[in-house]
Amino acid sequence: MYARFFALVSLFAFAMYLLVVSDNLLTLYIGWEIMGLCSYLLIGFWYGKESARKAGIKAFITTRIGDVFMLLGLAALYSLTGSLGFKEILSNHAVLDVLATSVSPVFGLSWAGLIGLLLFIGTVGKSAQFPLHVWLPDAMEGPTPVSAMIHAATMVSAGVYMVIRFFPLISAGWVPGEALTPTMSVMAFIGAFTALFAATIAMAQNDVKRVLAYSTISQLGYMVAALGIGAYTAAAFHLATHAFFKALLFLGSGSVIHGMEHGLMHTGETLDPQD
């Protein structure tokens, strides 16, 4: 059991490192998918428990919906530019200008806007934004260190990180101080709505880890909303600062649950330690 747990946690961390250090979208996507696999295996770690099995499958299927659209965005970007390298695309103003001015056949969006929107749908799944947020509260079925990792260091952070990394492409054609592009408007609306509705749901929860889960969804909504209005520096800052306190909150909640369970063995009271 311990060997399986630490092997999966190490692979999870490796996938996030691969995503962060990659210099092209292909290796980023490989790390992205390895994380999706590890989340399924770790959320369903207690596979003898039916609720844990169902939570793992739910997380895997929900995030795959976003990943399909992200893969379409990668394919469109490669077919138009012939490259998936960050330097070749994001540092090349000529390429960005062509993508921002050429019109795609979908809703009259520019190719930069369409590709940005497809990549953002991947983030909606990975970073648990509305309407693909449903997997994250159930991810509490995994061991507490896994919850802390998913909510702070890996998984949900990956989606926001990817949008920050690709902000020059997503915001191509936008001039600060002027009207937002359609893709940025969608990001701002989804982020703001998610931030409000998840915080409202959190107030009605009585399970300590579910309160923290909805809190994470809300905070990620703030980050996405900031990216939608062009404040990517603020989003990156909030992503880094949020990770520290949310990891500590989850580890602290796990310690409280563990301690109360030991106390209940002596008192015999029928109190839910997570309540």
Question: What role is predicted for each listed range?
Answer:
Residues 1-275:
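...captures the hydrophobic TM-helix bundle architecture rather than a specific catalytic motif
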